[in-house]
Amino acid sequence: MTRGLIFDLDQTLVDSSVALEARRRRDWNSVYSFIPQFKVYDGVKDALFMARSKGLRIAIVSSAPRSYVVKVLSYHNIPYDVIVGYHDASAPKPSSEPMLQALRLMALNPCEVISFGDKACDMISSRSAGVEFVACLWDHQANADRYQMRCASKVLNDSTSLKDCISRV
């Protein structure tokens, strides 16, 4: 039985591509200034609030610093229970450590959780932690990883399909 969901943040829940160059430079002050321009993908908030209403725990596992994740989630009113940022695990994705840390914080077993992400590193991290993985390929940047995502348990090509996917768990 599914009791929790783990999500990547950037290009999975929000389109943060406007800040991509600043992120590459690790210029977090510039990145923060772009947060109001980030767009939550269509249907994402509805899906997350529905998950909450079903009693599912929600974790965000990101390769970005926790402070950034908190700012994005707060600004865009995205619900969550647990955050695992770049510095919160002993090794970053694609290591299993961020996923295992999220599982510990949610007090759930891998078989009770489904993970959602847009990159191969999300899939590798999830699968190596024993967590089912759903590929979220609605962003144009995800196309680079499309071939590698063939090992995902499910592939979603449109963000509005997220709610339907979660409603079935």
What feature does the model see in each segment?
Residues S62-A64:
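Conserved phosphate-coupling serine/threonine residues in phosphotransfer and NTP-handling enzymes
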Residues I78-K93:
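A short, structured active-site edge motif that brings together acidic residues
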Residues M1-V40:
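Active-site neighborhood of HAD-like aspartate-dependent phosphohydrolases
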Residues S115-N157:
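Acidic, Mg2+-coordinating phosphoryl-transfer loop and its flanking beta/alpha structural elements
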Residues S96-M123:
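Conserved Lys-Pro-Asp/Glu-containing loop-to-beta segment of HAD-superfamily phosphomonoesterases
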Residues K54-L56, M106-E112, V169:
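Glycine-rich phosphate-binding loop signature in dinucleotide/nucleotide-binding domains
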Residues Y32-I60, V70, S74, S96:
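Short, acidic loop-to-helix structural element flanking the phosphoryl-transfer center
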Residues T12, A19, R66-S67, C121:
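Conserved Rossmann-like nucleotide-cofactor binding loop
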